C-alpha cells in the first residue's frame, strides 16, 4: 500500500503538470472503486482550472474554484502523467479514470480497486473538514509533531507502540513499512506498550519518523510490488531498509538476524539486539 512517502512523491510528480491547467475532459471508465465515483464528476470538473495539489496524510487534494476532488491510492493505485499529443495512449484494463488537460493526461490505475476518488464542494466547508480527513493526526513534518505529543497521547495505553503509530490518530502517513523502519532507527522494540515508552525515547522516535520519511521521499518511495511514480519509474528506498522484509538476514548494524512477527495481522520486523 502506498504510504506517505509514495503519496508525496506522486504529488510532487504530478503538480507541475496539472496546477494552473484547465481540465478539458474527464473519462470515467469504472463506476466505483472502494466507494462509488460521483456520477457528475466529469461534468463538475470540466472547464475548471486546478489551483494546486496538496496532501493530507495519504490523501491527495486537488483544488478547483468549486471545491476539491480527493484521491486515495488504496492498496495498488497509481497516478501517472502521460502525454496525449499527438496520439493519446490507449487505456489498459485497470486504468479507471483520465483527467485530460491540454497536453497531458493524468491517469488513475488501480488493479485491486481499493482506492477512492471523491468530491468535496466548497459550500460544504474546508476540505480538511471532510469526514475522512477531520479526525486525522498531525502531519509528521509539521511543528505540531513531537515526542512530547506522542508521549502525552499514549499515557496509560496498552496497545503496542507500533500499532499506535499505525493508527493515524497521533501522526498520519506512517504505514507498516515506515513504522518498522522508524522504530529501528529509534532503537525501540515494536511490541513495547505505547504507554511505557519514555519521553526521551519518544523524542528519538519523532526524529526517526521524520528522517525515515524524508529519506524515502528523496529516493522516490518504496516499490515492493505495484507502486510507480507519476513518470512510471519505481522507487528504490527498499534497497535501504534496515529491517522491513529482511527476516533472517543479518542486521545492518550489529549482525543479529532480523526477526519477523505478526501484530494486528501485519508483519513486523525488528532487530532483537538493537531494539529494546
Swiss-Prot record:
Cofactor note: Binds 1 zinc ion per subunit.
Pfam families on file: Fapy_DNA_glyco (PF01149), H2TH (PF06831), zf-FPG_IleRS (PF06827)
EC number: 3.2.2.23, 4.2.99.18
Keywords from the named record: DNA damage, DNA repair, DNA-binding, Glycosidase, Hydrolase, Lyase, Metal-binding, Multifunctional enzyme, Zinc, Zinc-finger
Cofactor(s), names only, from the UniProt record: Zn(2+)
Catalysed reactions listed for this entry: Hydrolysis of DNA containing ring-opened 7-methylguanine residues, releasing 2,6-diamino-4-hydroxy-5-(N-methyl)formamidopyrimidine; 2'-deoxyribonucleotide-(2'-deoxyribose 5'-phosphate)-2'-deoxyribonucleotide-DNA = a 3'-end 2'-deoxyribonucleotide-(2,3-dehydro-2,3-deoxyribose 5'-phosphate)-DNA + a 5'-end 5'-phospho-2'-deoxyribonucleoside-DNA + H(+)
Zinc finger (FPG-type): 242-276
Binding-site list for DNA: 94, 112, 157
Molecular function GO labels: 8-oxo-7,8-dihydroguanine DNA N-glycosylase activity; class I DNA-(apurinic or apyrimidinic site) endonuclease activity; damaged DNA binding; zinc ion binding
Alphabetical list of Gene3D superfamilies matching this protein: 1.10.8.50, MutM-like, N-terminal
GO BP annotations listed: base-excision repair
Positions of the catalytic residues: 2 (schiff-base intermediate with dna), 3 (proton donor), 58 (proton donor), 266 (proton donor)
Origin: domain of life: Bacteria
CDD domains membership: EcFpg-like_N
InterPro entries: DNA_glyclase/AP_lyase_DNA-bd, DNA_glyclase_Znf_dom_DNA_BS, Formamido-pyr_DNA_Glyclase, FPG_cat, MutM-like_N-ter, Ribosomal_uS13-like_H2TH, Znf_DNA_glyclase/AP_lyase, Znf_FPG/IleRS
Subunit structure, as described in the record: Monomer.
PANTHER family in the record: FORMAMIDOPYRIMIDINE-DNA GLYCOSYLASE (PTHR22993:SF9)
NCBIfam families xref list: fpg (TIGR00577), PRK01103.1 (NF002211)
Protein family: Belongs to the FPG family.
Annotated function: Involved in base excision repair of DNA damaged by oxidation or by mutagenic agents. Acts as a DNA glycosylase that recognizes and removes damaged bases. Has a preference for oxidized purines, such as 7,8-dihydro-8-oxoguanine (8-oxoG). Has AP (apurinic/apyrimidinic) lyase activity and introduces nicks in the DNA strand. Cleaves the DNA backbone by beta-delta elimination to generate a single-strand break at the site of the removed base with both 3'- and 5'-phosphates.
Annotated protein name in UniProt: Formamidopyrimidine-DNA glycosylase
Species: Paraburkholderia phytofirmans (strain DSM 17436 / LMG 22146 / PsJN) (Burkholderia phytofirmans)
Lineage: Bacteria, Pseudomonadati, Pseudomonadota, Betaproteobacteria, Burkholderiales
Gene expressing this chain: mutM
Amino acid at each position: 500500500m502506498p504510504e506517505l512517502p509514495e503519496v508525496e512523491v506522486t504529488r510532487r510528480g504530478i503538480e507541475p503538470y496539472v496546477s494552473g491547467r484547465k481540465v478539458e475532459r474527464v473519462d470515467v471508465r469504472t463506476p466505483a472503486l472502494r466507494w462509488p465515483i460521483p456520477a457528475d464528476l466529469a461534468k463538475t470538473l470540466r472547464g475548471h482550472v486546478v489551483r494546486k495539489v496538496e496532501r493530507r496524510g495519504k490523501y491527495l487534494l486537488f483544488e478547483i474554484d468549486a471545491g476539491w476532488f480527493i484521491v486515495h491510492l488504496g492498496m495498488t493505485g497509481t497516478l501517472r502523467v502521460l502525454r496525449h499529443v499527438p496520439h493519446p495512449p490507449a487505456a489498459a484494463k485497470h486504468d479507471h479514470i483520465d483527467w485530460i488537460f491540454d497536453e497531458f493526461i493524468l491517469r488513475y490505475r488501480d488493479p485491486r480497486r481499493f482506492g477512492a476518488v471523491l468530491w468535496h464542494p466548497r459550500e460544504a466547508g474546508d476540505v480538511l473538514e471532510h469526514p475522512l480527513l477531520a479526525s486525522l493526526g498531525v502531519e509528521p513534518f509539521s511543528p505540531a509533531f513531537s515526542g512530547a505529543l506522542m508521549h502525552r497521547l499514549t499515557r496509560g495505553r496498552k496497545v503496542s507502540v507500533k500499532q499506535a503509530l499505525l493508527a493515524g490518530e497521533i501522526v498520519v502517513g506512517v504505514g507498516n513499512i515506515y513504522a518498522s523502519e522508524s522504530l529501528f532507527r529509534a532503537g525501540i522494540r515494536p511490541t513495547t506498550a505505547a504507554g511505557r515508552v519514555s519521553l526521551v525515547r519518544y523524542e528519538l522516535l519523532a526524529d526517526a519518523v521524520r528522517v525515515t520519511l524524508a529519506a524515502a521521499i528523496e529516493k522516490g518511495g518504496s516499490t515492493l510490488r505495484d507502486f510507480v511514480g507519476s513518470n512510471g519509474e519505481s522507487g528504490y528506498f527498499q534497497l535501504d531498509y534496515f529491517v522491513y522484509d529482511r527476516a533472517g538476514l543479518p542486521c545492518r548494524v550489529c549482525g543479529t538476524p532480523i526477526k519477523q512477527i505478526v501484530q494486528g495481522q501485519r508483519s513486523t520486523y525488528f532487530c532483537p539486539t538493537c531494539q529494546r
